[in-house]
Each structure stands twice: as structure tokens, then as C-alpha cells.
């Protein structure tokens, strides 16, 4: 056919196809300050996970009348076929949100996986996107992708994340190292980034106290379902915003928060290391999950997954912790936390985090609901998931899986304490993750078990949420990452680029 290329099934040449994608990109480029692109990670192989998400998006209470004439068996078979088709395309979805209306549009679907569980962007390289893979059979991976101008994601590299069920990625202050957190075996890894932003083999893997349980006992996920706190489960590594030097690791299994510094090596033949500066013990059984810091107040908020509460802390940053660390001088290695040597627990007055409030994420009447598994093991009817502070600093939100709602709180401008506003239905089942649009006018919620993403308008005065739109066929969403559309001008990679050049 010459320069026009071969026709596809719709009769479009390759050049015409590129033109269609460019037109779509131009439509997205009709700017509004709150226009946002959301990268949504999704589960694709549930048998590899520590938990068991259920895709209820095609059958159940929401079935329409058209399907009512079919038997349950026929509907299940149809559901499986549709879900298999969805999963074959799934991995990472790219959605665009209209900053005027809150409407969501599916832009691209990228076959990257399995089980993309966390998504983030390089701090200084706008083309570079990272994702972690969540699995317990082998070590998870950090997947490096290139974002193109037509909003596709091209995988360019993979490396080990240093442990299993990789659930969180972050960067140290110099941006020379990525920090990964692995839930299943409570291992933290430091991974050097090359000049193009590509992560290399982990330089240092650090085992949290008690983490050898996984290596020694080889627990099954059935054991995990019954005993969520039998061994450590590190869930996130969050950097304080005051100096960008202290990294807070929350461990669900230990009911503890550890405070680390990263010691960088003097040469690339030596290894970096985590240096523990403090740890904070929490009330047993809370099951802490994620920590966030207020933008202007020295206040931190911790969501406790197992009892559906938020703990509110005053933050105390010790000046001595900011002093220069001695340079690491050992070869890349596996390190184990020395509980007696490395744990530093202070009094309430000098603790890194001093709790002064604990508040439920559930409305009255839903706080004491319990269910029992088939084996008679107690389990709460709802478990808290993500926690985020609104960009305005005026409100805080938490996901409730089971209650299927987003809890809304007002933040006191003086002391950072919380006032419960309401729990708003999440627009689906099992709201696992959510994030705000560029200016905070909307919040997008990934509902895992209904395979949809719902957008809500945020009232700037009250903080209440109003459902605007639900985008279906987003397979088992588990992480929602926003990119302000205004920053897409910095993305220079085009769809025509065949070589991997960042």
C-alpha cells in the first residue's frame, strides 16, 4: 500500500490510526486546570496474591433486566467469558478526567503485569513511570515504563523488588535510589537508578524484625487469611515533608512504625543502607496500613486497616536525626533488623509520632459489625484501605472496604484533629484506592470487586463528595495515580519512537 501502511479491520491505514490517536490526544489537550490523567493498576492473576479479590462486576444485585431471563449458570459462564476478555487486556489502564464535568474516558489499556499494585512517576523525568507487581510465589518486580504523548505505556525494563508482594515505591532525597516495600516477607530494598531513571538490581535488602518467618516457615495464603498479624507485613514507606530525609515504614503485622534514614555510599561499588532512627509501638490489633502527613501542620494520619480507625499524631523530628550519616562501605547485602540494637523507642513527649486522637472511619451502627469465616475465625465486616489528605489541607478521606464507602473528615486548622463528616457510598464494591484530580475538584475511586472507577465532585466548603460518573470495565483496580494534564507538555516520547530512549 506504500506510505499509508496496511489497513486494519476497520479499514484504517496505520497513518490514519495514528491520526485518530493524535486527535484523541488533542481532545484531551483542551485544557482545564483540573484536567487529569489517571493511571490505574489492576489485578490480573488473583491466584498469586496474598488476598483474594472477587470480581462481582458482571453478576449480582446490579444485573439489568436484560440478563434476568438467563439462568445463574448461564450468567456465570457469560461473566467468566467477559472477565477473561477484560483481563487479557488489563494490567494498566489510562483514564482521562474532564476537569469541568468529572466525566472519565478510557484512553488506553496496557498489557503489563501481573498484578500491577503501585504506580508512581520519576521525580524529575516526566516520561518515566514505575509500577510494582504483587505476587507471593516469587519476588515482585519494579516495571519501568515510558509514557508516550498518546498516553500509552511502553515497558522498557524490569528488575527485582527484593521481596514478595511488592506494595509501595518511593525515592530518597537525592533521587538516586528507589525504596521498595514488600508486604509478604517484610523486606525493604534500596535500588539504584541509572542516569535514565532505570532501576538496577537491589543494592541492599533489609529485613524487618520477624521477617525470617516467611523464609523459615513458608506460610500459605490460607494461613495469612486467618492470622493477619502472625508475622510482619510492611505496607508503605512515606517520607516526611519537612526535611525529606526521614522515611516512615508502617508494619501491619507488628503494629509498629519505624523511622529510617538512608545512608548513601561513597562509590557505586559499595551499598546504601537503611539506618533506623526510631520506632513507635501502636495499640495491639490495629493493623496499621498507610501513613500521610499534613502539608502545613506537623500532623500525621495513620489508617488502621483491621479496626477501621485513623490515629492522629503530632510529629516530632529530632534534629540529631538530620545529622550526616557515615557513608556505607560494605558490598551489596541482605541485612536483618536487630530488634535490640536498632529499635529506639522514646517517651510520649519525645516520640517521633505522639498520638492524640483515634477516630472511626465508619458511621455509628456499622462500627461493631463482625462476620465469621467458614473456619470460625473472626473478621471485621469492613477493613479500611487508602488514606489521603485533600490538596487544600482542609479535609481527609479514607476508603472502607466492606462498608463500601469513602469516609470524609474535616481537619481542624489549628491542631489537625479530625471531625467525622459522613461516609459516602463509593460507587462500587471494595474501594481499595483513590486519588484527587490536579486541583482537587474531583476524587477518583478504584472499586476493586466491581471493576470500576468512580469520580466524585469534592465540595470545597464542606468536603462532601457527590458521585458524578462511573467508568466500568476497569479490571480489578487496586491503585489510582494522577498526572495533571498540564504536565503532559513535558512528555516528549511519541508513538513513533521505536527505540527505548528516555
Model-identified regions with their sequence ranges:
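Short coil/turn segments that connect the beta-strands within blades of beta-propeller domains
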Residues: 35-36, 126-127, 174-176, 242-245, ...
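Short loop/turn segments immediately following beta-strands, especially the blade-tip
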Residues: 95-102, 145-151, 190-201, 261-271, ...
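Asp-box/WD-like beta-propeller blade repeats and closely related beta-sheet repeat scaffolds
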Residues: 152-236
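Surface-exposed loop and turn segments in beta-propeller and other repeat-based domains
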Residues: 204-229, 278-279, 328-378, 472-487
Amino acid at each position: 500500500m506504500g506510505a499509508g501502511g496496511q489497513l486494519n479491520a476497520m479499514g484504517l491505514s496505520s497513518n490514519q490510526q495514528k491520526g485518530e490517536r493524535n486527535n484523541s490526544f488533542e481532545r484531551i489537550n483542551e485544557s482545564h486546570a483540573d484536567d487529569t490523567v489517571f493511571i490505574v493498576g489492576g489485578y490480573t492473576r488473583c491466584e498469586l496474591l496474598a488476598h483474594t479479590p472477587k470480581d462481582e462486576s458482571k453478576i449480582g444485585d446490579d444485573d439489568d433486566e436484560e440478563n434476568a431471563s438467563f439462568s445463574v449458570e448461564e450468567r456465570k459462564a457469560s461473566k467468566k467469558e467477559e472477565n477473561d476478555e477484560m483481563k487479557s487486556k488489563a494490567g494498566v489502564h489510562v483514564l482521562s478526567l474532564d476537569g469541568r464535568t468529572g466525566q472519565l474516558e478510557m484512553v488506553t489499556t496496557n498489557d503489563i503485569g501481573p498484578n500491577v499494585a503501585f504506580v508512581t512517576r520519576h521525580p524529575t523525568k516526566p516520561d518515566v513511570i514505575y509500577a510494582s507487581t504483587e505476587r507471593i510465589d516469587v519476588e515482585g518486580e519494579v516495571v519501568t515504563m515510558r509514557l508516550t504523548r498518546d498516553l500509552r505505556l511502553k515497558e522498557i525494563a524490569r528488575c527485582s523488588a527484593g521481596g514478595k508482594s511488592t506494595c509501595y515505591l518511593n525515592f530518597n532525597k537525592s533521587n538516586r535510589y528507589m525504596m521498595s516495600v514488600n508486604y509478604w516477607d517484610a523486606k525493604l530494598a534500596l535500588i539504584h537508578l541509572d542516569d535514565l531513571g532505570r532501576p538496577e538490581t537491589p543494592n541492599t535488602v533489609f529485613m524487618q524484625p520477624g521477617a525470617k518467618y516467611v523464609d523459615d516457615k513458608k506460610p500459605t495464603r490460607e494461613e495469612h487469611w486467618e492470622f493477619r498479624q502472625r508475622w510482619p507485613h510492611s505496607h508503605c514507606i512515606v517520607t516526611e515533608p519537612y526535611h525529606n530525609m526521614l522515611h516512615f515504614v508502617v508494619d501491619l503485622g507488628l503494629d509498629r512504625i519505624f523511622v529510617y534514614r538512608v545512608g548513601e555510599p561513597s562509590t557505586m561499588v559499595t551499598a546504601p543502607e537503611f539506618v533506623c532512627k526510631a520506632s513507635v509501638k501502636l495499640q495491639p490489633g490495629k493493623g496499621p496500613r498507610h501513613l500521610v502527613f499534613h502539608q502545613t501542620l506537623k500532623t500525621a494520619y495513620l489508617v488502621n486497616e483491621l479496626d477501621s480507625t485513623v490515629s492522629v499524631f503530632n510529629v516530632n523530628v529530632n534534629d540529631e536525626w538530620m545529622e550526616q550519616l557515615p557513608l556505607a562501605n560494605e558490598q551489596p547485602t541482605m541485612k536483618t533488623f536487630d530488634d535490640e540494637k536498632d529499635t529506639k523507642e522514646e517517651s510520649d513527649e519525645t516520640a517521633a509520632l505522639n498520638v492524640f486522637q483515634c477516630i472511626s472511619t465508619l458511621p455509628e451502627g456499622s462500627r461493631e459489625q463482625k462476620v465469621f469465616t467458614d473456619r470460625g475465625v473472626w473478621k471485621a465486616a469492613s477493613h479500611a484501605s487508602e488514606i489521603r489528605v485533600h490538596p487544600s489541607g482542609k479535609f481527609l478521606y479514607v476508603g472502607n472496604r466492606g462498608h463500601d464507602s469513602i469516609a470524609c473528615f474535616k481537619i481542624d486548622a489549628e491542631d489537625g484533629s479530625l471531625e467525622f463528616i459522613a461516609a459516602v457510598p463509593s460507587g462500587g464494591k471494595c474501594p481499595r484506592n483513590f486519588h484527587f484530580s490536579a486541583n482537587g475538584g474531583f476524587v477518583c475511586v478504584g472499586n476493586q470487586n466491581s471493576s470500576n472507577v468512580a469520580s466524585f465532585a469534592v465540595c470545597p466548603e464542606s468536603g462532601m463528595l457527590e458521585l458524578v460518573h462511573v467508568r466500568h470495565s476497569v479490571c480489578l483496580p487496586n491503585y489510582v495515580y494522577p498526572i495533571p494534564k498540564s504536565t503532559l507538555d513535558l512528555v516528549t516520547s511519541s508513538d513513533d519512537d521505536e527505540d527505548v530512549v528516555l
